[in-house]
Amino acid sequence: MHDKVLILDFGSQVTQLIARRVREAHVYCEIHPNDVSDAFVREFAPKAIILSGSHASTYEDHQLRAPQAVWDLGVPVLGICYGMQTMAVQLGGKVEWSDHREFGYAEVRAHGHTRLLKDIQDFATPEGHGMLKVWMSHGDKVTELPPGFKLLASTPSCPVAGMADEARGYYAVQFHPEVTHTVQGRALLERFVLEIAGAKPDWVMRDHIDEAVKAIREQVGDEEVILGLSGGVDSSVAAALIHRAIGDQLTCVFVDHGLLRLDEGKMVMDMFAGRLHAKVVHVDASEQFLGHLAGVTDPEAKRKIIGREFVEVFQAEAKKLSNAKWLAQGTIYPDVVESGGTKTKKATTIKSHHNVGGLPETLGLKLLEPLRDLFKDEVRELGVALGLPHEMVYRHPFPGPGLGVRILGEVKREYADLLRRADAIFIEELRGTKATAQDAAAGLCGEGDVGKSWYDLTSQAFAVFLPIKSVGVMGDGRTYDYVTALRAVQTTDFMTAHWAHLPYALLGRVSNRIINEVRGLSRVVYDVSGKPPATIEWE
């Protein structure tokens, strides 16, 4: 029996990152809504409890509280952001609105006299104070500590950035240790889970495979499953996992919606039908998709249309299978959280994903999403454990709506053809260019990255078609053609991301090739936006 950590979700966009960090410590955990019953908390028998953040305010939403059993069990509790504030309010402290809200990078003075932060710091001030580089996102602040608590951390604008009652094992921080921007966040969470709570680090991906296979078999029984295969990492791993569970009860449907990458159709069929010996049906629905997208410019409308058409194609194919009752998808957690689909339903919707937002209530198939609670890096780890080839598992992710969300505004076949070729050039150059010692010396990569391709050093890279024209000069003549943007990011979980600092020589070569080889494009720009505030995809 694994030790378990209970994460209570108050509606934060990054709650699942807490689970990701706990799993990285090889400790089993589950996320549940903050309003579960006291009986549920007791029956769960957690080794520790973590309270998530929230976009809500403790003094405006008096119902958003942790169950009383959290405080009665006698197990260690860690509050994060809103979790700290509700801990303060529920245990006799005070929270007030702050006239100096903090969103983004901050430096926190760590008061290292507690077990949680002892010897954990990023640097020390000339006065000898330990400092942490963290990520803040709060508008309220704790102004009075609950009885029995002492100060854990502080900033000039947030005097109580952390607090602790070590006698009861209660700790709380105003910043977010779960996001990668908080440099010592993983160390802090591991300290809490492994040392303070004493949880055993015995949960590994092999356990998840066994549990997922068992769950799929129990859920599906002897019914058939149809899966929409895109060739991307998520749907590929989902297909392999489901195939391991139920074999030929799975039929993969590969839909060519006219918005795929260059030569993707051939690659998908060769890989899945040829190498994996799975049942794959190839459907050319490009005319259907492009026809419905004609004249549509709103990003949400485009995503909804693409999702709707996917469902219609799947339903049509399912009717050809005598026992098809399930529609499987490679939905992963970032898709769910950006669609406001967290377990509490309290997270704010950022944008709809076709996997989770395009399914009508009248869908005649039940939904099977075996990767729904996993992050991209976990999905890759799962794929390797399932025996999938490296080139499949570590291929950059591709959105379900395809180039439809990489063409700003109206989607046209002409635009898709231009974008396909520009994107292929970008990816080809990334694959063919290796990081050098000079790149490392310039801070573009680490010393251990020298010799790796820039494709492997970026988490996701692609081109975006901009429906605007720019004046250029080719030979002795004037041109007036479209603009394309290049986007490359580095991330571990796709919930937050940094733009990739690619070498200028590489970017210059990509730009030169696109302008010279893709007639219809006259200018190339590079996107230097992080996530947040921008999302990785432009639409």
UniProtKB/Swiss-Prot annotation:
Entry keywords, A to Z: ATP-binding, Glutamine amidotransferase, GMP biosynthesis, Ligase, Nucleotide-binding, Purine biosynthesis
InterPro entries per UniProt: Class_I_gatase-like, GATASE, GMP_synth_C, GMP_synth_GATase, GMP_synthase, GMPS_ATP_PPase_dom, NAD/GMP_synthase, Rossmann-like_a/b/a_fold
Enzyme Commission number(s): 6.3.5.2
Pfam family, one: GMP_synt_C
Protein name in the entry: GMP synthase [glutamine-hydrolyzing]
Binding of ATP, residues: 230-236
Catalysed transformations (reactions): XMP + L-glutamine + ATP + H2O = GMP + L-glutamate + AMP + diphosphate + 2 H(+)
Every Glutamine amidotransferase type-1 domain range: 4-202
PANTHER family named in the record: GMP SYNTHASE [GLUTAMINE-HYDROLYZING] (PTHR11922:SF2), GMP SYNTHASE-RELATED (PTHR11922)
Pathway: Purine metabolism; GMP biosynthesis; GMP from XMP (L-Gln route): step 1/1
Purpose of the protein: Catalyzes the synthesis of GMP from XMP.
Domain GMPS ATP-PPase stretches: 203-395
Residue positions of the active site: 81, 176, 178
GO cellular component, one term: cytosol
GO MF terms, alphabetically ordered: ATP binding; GMP synthase activity
Gene3D superfamilies in UniProt: 3.30.300.10, 3.40.50.880, HUPs
CDD domains: GATase1_GMP_Synthase, GMP_synthase_C
Domain of life: Bacteria
Subunit structure: Homodimer.
